[in-house]
């Protein structure tokens, strides 16, 4: 099962974040921009420096915020459920994804029906080749290799929805 690692301090403090694999190799990096229509997080392949995915802030007619996430030919949106007092999310994607857990503290899972496809945890971890001590790290585990990039954009969309709420 593929895993990606994001240093929690970098994500909170910097507008550019490196994303590592199990061996400590940088596989993606992100760049957060603010443009006239809202926030946009671009995801680049680390080796080729080409944009491979993005997360874009969008507004509807009622003024509610949602984030569009896209990777190659796969895309969807995620928004906070305005009818719920709890942290519930409305996911519009071609597969029925459901979030179980608490995204505010990076401890949740994403299910497609009854199958867990993404697991997100935040805990002290030593990324190989990146640190000499344990650092707060967001660990994203995917069920299959084909869901890695779209899953990463989805996780960053949830993060952006929680961070940039007004």
Q: Which sequence ranges carry the predicted segments?
A:
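Intrinsically disordered, low-complexity proline/glycine-rich segments
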Residues: 1-166
